[in-house]
């Protein structure tokens, strides 16, 4: 299992970005979280197969219809201690 931390910036808060990310992550079999950050970005930490992480990263660039994604950064991280994907 691999894990990655993504930081998504742009118009990504107040547009159902976290909930949509959770739906996509669960469909891909990933665990982790999506959280709003004080700077207006969304942090996504996800763990699963390399292919699923790649598919999530590609989706993060699109997001839900109301979002405008300007940047997605990816860094490796520790596997999150959860068996689900949550928003918070």
UniProtKB/Swiss-Prot annotation:
Gene3D superfamilies: 3.30.70.100. It comes from Xanthomonas oryzae pv. oryzae (strain KACC10331 / KXO85). This is Acylphosphatase. The active site is at residues 18, 36. Residues 3-88 form the Acylphosphatase-like domain. Keywords: Hydrolase. Belongs to the acylphosphatase family. Its EC number is 3.6.1.7. PROSITE patterns: ACYLPHOSPHATASE_3 (PS51160).
């Amino acid at each position: 299992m691999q894990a990655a931390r993504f930081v998504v910036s742009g118009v990504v808060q107040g547009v159902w970005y976290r909930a949509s990310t959770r739906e996509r992550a669960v469909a891909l079999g990933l665990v982790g979280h999506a959280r709003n950050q004080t700077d207006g970005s969304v942090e996504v930490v996800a763990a699963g197969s390399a292919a699923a992480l790649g598919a999530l990263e590609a989706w993060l660039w699109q997001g839900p219809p109301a979002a405008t994604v300007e940047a997605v950064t990816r860094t490796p991280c520790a596997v999150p201690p959860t068996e689900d994907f949550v928003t918070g």
